Amino acid sequence: MKVVFLEDVKGQGKKGQIKEVPTGYAQNFLIKKNLAKVATAAALSEVKGQAKAKEKEEAELLAEAKALKEVLEKDETVVEIKMKVGQTGHTFGAVDKADIAKALKSQFGLKLDKRKIQLINKIQALGTKDVPVKLHRDVTAMVKVKISEA
């Protein structure tokens, strides 16, 4: 019996895949547990429609990420964070992902999830540093972060 998988089934098939499976297995397990349905013309067109919608949504997300990358990589987009500095020139504390995200929102109105900022070590020195931001799996932007004395 030909079925269209509605969810991933280990060892059988992935979501949206059309596959020939034993009739008993299809009727008693896959269809009963709503993991698959019989591959009729209506079911096939529904799966194709879902695939097109998912593809369109993915393209929109990619375009949005590319537009945000353009904004973040402009020369005038420099995130400035002020820190207290001791007499020896060392900073008190460090700048982390959350601080950068908060500064982006307050200075440029860009709401960015701190988990997308790819900062390996906290910034503890004065100066300018390029910080990578992963906006999409295919799009990574570099943000300039300037740490200055308060």
Swiss-Prot record:
It comes from Lactococcus lactis subsp. cremoris (strain SK11). This is Large ribosomal subunit protein bL9. It holds the Pfam family Ribosomal_L9_N. GO terms for biological process: translation. It comes from the Bacteria. The gene is rplI. One of its GO terms (molecular function) is structural constituent of ribosome. Binds to the 23S rRNA. Keywords: Ribonucleoprotein, Ribosomal protein, RNA-binding, rRNA-binding. Belongs to the bacterial ribosomal protein bL9 family. InterPro entries: Ribosomal_bL9, Ribosomal_bL9/RNase_H1_N, Ribosomal_bL9_bac/chp, Ribosomal_bL9_C, Ribosomal_bL9_C_sf, Ribosomal_bL9_N, Ribosomal_bL9_N_sf. The keyword Lyase does not apply. Signal peptide: none annotated. GO terms for cellular component: ribonucleoprotein complex; ribosome. PANTHER family: 50S RIBOSOMAL PROTEIN L9.
